[in-house]
């Protein structure tokens, strides 16, 4: 199963393309604005506007062998802890070897913004980011399918 933190996710078309190629189900989770799909392998879940509602929905369901796409580091922390494969929309993989540093850097950035030491700018999403995401996401989907085959479970 693929879970996508879909609010402001710039790689939804890429997720669909790779998921279709691998025959994997996709669940897009957002608090508004999802385009309906007729594809039986695609599910849209609209959650409340409550703080972290989409993150909580995904974290409560994602488990070992699932693939999660999110730019939200706290959600990535929760999903990595369950054994899910996690990628950001720029192709950055979050795993047990780097999630602690990613979380610390996020917290440091938040602190610097609060104290006025940083303006908190985010780089724009580039074609290179999209390409890197496609490569990373395809690799994670293959790993998820391989794990499902080894354990007899669903990807």
Curated annotation (Swiss-Prot):
Entries under Pfam families matching the protein? DUF188
Q: Which CDD domains match?
A: PIN_YqxD-like (cd18720)
Q: Which family does it belong to?
A: Belongs to the UPF0178 family.
What PANTHER family would the database entry show? UPF0178 PROTEIN YAII
Designated name of the protein = UPF0178 protein RHE_CH02229
Task: Say which species the protein is native to.
Answer: Rhizobium etli (strain ATCC 51251 / DSM 11541 / JCM 21823 / NBRC 15573 / CFN 42)
């Amino acid at each position: 199963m693929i879970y996508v933190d879909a609010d402001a996710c710039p790689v939804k078309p890429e997720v669909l393309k790779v998921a279709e190629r691998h025959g994997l189900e996709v669940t897009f989770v957002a608090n508004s604005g999802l385009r309906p799909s007729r594809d039986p392998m695609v599910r849209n879940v609209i959650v409340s506007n409550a703080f972290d509602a989409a993150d909580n929905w995904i974290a409560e369901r994602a488990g070992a062998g699932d693939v999660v796409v999110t730019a939200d580091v706290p959600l990535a922390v929760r999903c990595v802890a369950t054994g899910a494969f996690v990628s950001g929309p720029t192709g950055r993989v979050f795993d047990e070897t780097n999630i602690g540093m990613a979380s610390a850097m996020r917290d440091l950035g938040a602190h610097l913004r609060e104290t006025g030491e940083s303006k908190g700018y985010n780089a724009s999403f580039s074609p290179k980011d999209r390409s890197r995401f496609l490569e990373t996401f395809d690799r994670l989907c293959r790993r998820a399918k391989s794990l499902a085959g080894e354990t007899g479970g669903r990807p």
